[in-house]
Structure formats: structure tokens, C-alpha cells
Amino acid sequence: MDKARKGQSTRKPPEPSDSHDVIDAWMRSQMPDLQPIVDGLDRIIRDELPELQYAVKWKKAYYRVPEQGWVIELVAYDVSVNVVFLGGADLASPPPLGAGDRSRYIKVRSWDEVDEAQIRRWIRDAGEVAGWQ
């Protein structure tokens, strides 16, 4: 049986919303250079995972598959965006960054460096493993 990811310390998971509006507002608040990255990643996530729920908490965007929990987190920094797969260690081919708990991630500094086929595989796979409950 898959072990559910526990949140860091005593943090509670975000409250889910069926409306994408919270993510839209979060994307608009990001640095202009990061706009193409967050827009592209959001589009791919929504293409690959139907019936998502959304949240923004701790200045991070969260994507939830109802049966699995929160499976993806987007974190925008000054010059890059991290795509965190909250059950990433359980993926068939885990993303390269991260250690410790079950999270694994990739860092995207420009849309040109995106391997869209690989990201799509990770996103599809993330929808099949237990995330953060």
C-alpha cells in the first residue's frame, strides 16, 4: 500500500477549490520573465490531469487529484520555477532533484529548456500515485 505523504511539520494541506481562478491570480502575480514558464506548466498539468482541484497556499500553487490528494506544487522564485511532484519518489522514473521524503522536483529556468514529453510523463504518473493528503 502506498504511504501517504505527510506535510512538513504541522502544516495542513490547502483547502481545495474546483475553480482555476486561484491559480490564474497566482500566475499573474509572478515575475514577468516567469510568466511563459508558469503558463506553459499550468497548461500541461491541466491537459494531462482531468478533474483537478486547485489551491494557493504559502505562495505556492497546488494541483489535486481527488483520489490521490495534492500531487503537484509549483513554486516560483526570482529566476526559476520548481515543479514539485509530491509523490515523486514513487514514480517509475523519478525527477532528478530532491531527497528525503517522497517529493522530487525539477527546476525550470526558461521554457526553451523544457522537455515537454518528459514533463507530461511525470505529470501523468503523478496522478496515479498517492500525494499529500
Predicted feature locations:
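Charge-dense, helix-prone N-terminal extensions
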Residues: 1-133
